[in-house]
Structures are given as structure tokens and as C-alpha cells.
Amino acid sequence: MKKIKKKDIVLYLVMLTFCIIVCAPLLQMHIASDTYNFMDLGYFQYPSQYFLKDARIISTLFTYLAGILNLDYQVFIVGMEVLAVIIASFSIYILYKTIGKKLSENIYNMNLKNSIILMAITIIIFNCMSLEYFLYAECAVMCLSVLLSIIAAKIFIEEKNKHKYVKILLILTLATFCYQGSINIFITLVTLLLIIDKSKVNIKENIKQFIIAGIIFVVSEIVNIICMYLINNFMGSEQERVAGNVIIRNILLFNPLMKFIIENVFILNFNLWPSMIIPIFIGISIILILCSKKKIRGLIEYIFLILVAVLASILPVFLMKSPGIEPRMVMSAGSIIGISIIYLSYIFNDEKSKIMQDIIFVITMIFFIFNTINTIQIFSAHIATNKIDANMGITIKYKIEKYENETGNNVTKVAYRRDSMHRDFPYGYKKKLSSFTQRAFDNYYCIIEALNYYCNRKFEKTTMDEKIYTDNFLGKNWNTYSDEQIVFEGDTMYICTY
């Protein structure tokens, strides 16, 4: 067994410290919209109803185990977040060593070149699309999927034996059983590593290796889909994610679907990065590449790399029964800025390019600082949103108890509707930060479940009484909680959310 060097331990601890600082806001009890449903259904029903049907077997096993151990939800959620931080730091560590060996003589010497590589890798792991991997109750398993994809890419490039492809397929398939949406980073990293690996200068061989990597990527997804169908068939249920017969329908929707993807992923970045930052960075990278000695080849390689990153993210959407996209599904597209920096470092990886290396370092440092602060702010905004939801939930709880004490009625049913100009993120924020600032009491997916959590009850959902709605809520608009938003009648609470 290879002895672990002291330098490697120090290197990992530095990366772990960075991850702890960035994720510090989430190292406490926090609740995403899905988490309300998770806590409402419990450790066994929720994974059976959601994870297992989607062939997310590892997430299912984790939650089953927590149920067997009868863990408190707070212990489970915080524990999974701690585990996610540890796993993410391993992802940075392994990716840094893998890429660093291709571009640097000594990866332990934190010179300008290595600093660029390390900052770029943290931007890849903590890109705006992958931040949701730290949000949900199963966050550690989602981060594990990323780590397994990175390990698969590392083995693909570094190992020479004949059996490596079987090993990679098994690892990548295991990654799909954690979370399918993150494995698109595998093919993007393989493409990047093939390009920057000086030992792989044969273009035909590189194309062959890329095709093999693509086949492994597709086969792992197919295996996951087959398992999905088998599991649902065994359970007597119908899976709701993917189907081969919807490809033609989704292709016919190509224009509106691509418009939606381009707008949200590449222009707005789901409001998690500044608008247009990815296209702008691609433009800057192209300008810098045109200043290099390898103008033509560099441009071809870079454009191909970007196309792979984009297509790996968006092509699976065309298999979906309900085509749509969320940040967590397109980590590969979000990694474009990080991989662009690494490619630029490769292009100008010689002593004569000192000025260009300085320029790349300044650009990288500016974006690294921004991304770190931005990530902490996004995580903090999620905690602030949780507190707003908690305040409203606890206030409603006391209001219900007061009504019950005064009338003797027992509230068992809830009907809800939104006000005339509702917004699903807190007032005080100019824009919604994806799922991080999604208010529970404006999300039809989890309003009842949030009420159940804060009131410690099991309410029954019922329909809104039109007369009560017209008399009390019609045309009204609030920007904060008000007692006017709640009306009681018998055993039913009618609520109009703002």
C-alpha cells in the first residue's frame, strides 16, 4: 500500500479548511423545500417514493440506515452536510493532483501556476450550478456522485491496463446510483485531461479515447435507466423521469426548450452568478488564446471543450418526460469558467508566457474571490429564508392553538391559495437565488408539509372555499405575514400566502 505523504495530508487539510469556511452557513439545521417532504414522509416512505423510483439507490440506503438508527432529522441533515464538506474537499484534492501533474513540476509548491490551477478547481467544484449539491438532506450522496465521476476521469487518463474501462464503467454507474445529474462532469474532465496531457499528443488516439469515454458515459446512463425501469416494475409503479419515446416530442420542442436552457443556464445562471458571466468568460478566453502561439489549434481545442461541457449537460434533457432544467443538472456547463482557466494555464504553460500567466492569475484571483464570497452569501441567504419560514410557521402554530382554545374546535384541514401578486422568494431580495431562497409557504410542493413541521401536526389538504376567498383574500396583496391571511371555519384553516 502506498504511503501517504505528509505533504498530501497538509494539502488536503488546506482544501478541507477552505470547504468548511465556504459551507459554514450550512453546517447547521437547514431545510430545502424537498426536505419538508422528506421529514413529513419519513426515512422509509420518502426514499421509497422518490429516490428508489429514480434509481438513486445510494441515497435510498443512506436514508434507510438513518431510519433504522432512528436518527433525529437535525442530526441526519447536519451530519450529511459535514460528510458533504469532507467529500467535496476530496474532490478538490484529487482533481488538483490529477490536473497539477499534467501542468506542474511540483504540485506542492504554491507558485503562481499551481495557485491558478487550485483556484480554478475550487471554481469547478463550487460553480453556480453545483451549489445545490450542498442544499438537500441527501447532500453527501450528491457530492459523492461528483467525487466518483472525478475518480473515474482520473483512472481513464492515468491507468494503462486493459481492464480499466470496466472499472470506470462500474464507478460511473455507481455515481448514477448516487445522483445522475452530476456525472456529466466526467466526460468534460476527460476531454480536458486528454487535451492538456503532454503524453497524449496523437490526435487520432485522443479522438479514439474521447469516443470510448463517451460510450462509457452513455452506457452508465443506460444501465441506470434500465435499473430505474426494473425497480418501478418490481414496485408496481411508473417512473416519471425519462422515456425513450419522448425524444421526438422533445426535439419538436427544440426551439422553446433551447431558449429556456440558454436563458437560464448561460444568460441568467439561475441568478446564482452575474448575468452573461459564462459567455463573457468564453469571449475573454478566446481573445487570450488568439494571443498565443497555438492560435488555430488552441481555438479548435477550446471550442470543442466548451461544446462537450454544454452538450453533456443539455442532451439528457431530451430524454425527460417533463423537459426542464435545474442548476444541479448542469454541473458540466457551470464548470466552463474553471476549465477555461485550466486550459488557458495549459496554453501559456512556458517561461516565455510570464506576462500572460500574470494576466490569467489576476483574472483567476478576482473570480475566485468573487465566487467564494458569492457562495457564502447564497448559503447565508438560504439560512435567512429558513428563518423567515420558521417565524411564519411558529406564528401560525400559535394562531391555531389560540383559535382551538377559544372555540373548542380542532383544526385538521388546510386550504391555501396565493395572493394577487405573490413572490416565491423573500422581500428584501431583488431576485430569487434558485432553490436557496424558495419560500416554503409559497411553494405548493411543500406548504402542507411545512405547516406539519412547524405545527407538529398532520394536516389534511382541502380545497379553498370560494366565498371565504372572495370575502377575505380576493385582490389583496401582502409583502409580509399578516393575521389577515388566515381565516378559520370549523376544523379548517384557510390561508392566503404572500
Question: What feature does the model see in each segment?
Answer:
Residues 2-57, 61-63, 67-117, 203-206, ...:
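Intrinsically disordered, polar/acidic, low-complexity terminal segments
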Residues 23, 71, 210-281, 317:
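Membrane-lumen/periplasm interface segments of specific transmembrane helices
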Residues 52, 56, 111-157, 177-178, ...:
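Membrane-interface micro-motifs in multi-pass membrane enzymes
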Residues 120, 294-319, 366:
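Transmembrane alpha-helix segments characteristic
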Residues 149-165, 197-201:
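Membrane-interface transmembrane helices that cradle and orient dolichyl/undecaprenyl
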Residues 164-180, 185-191:
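Membrane-interface alpha helices of multi-pass inner-membrane proteins
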Residues 185-218:
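Perimembrane helix-loop-helix junctions
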Residues 273-299:
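Hydrophobic, aromatic-rich transmembrane alpha-helices
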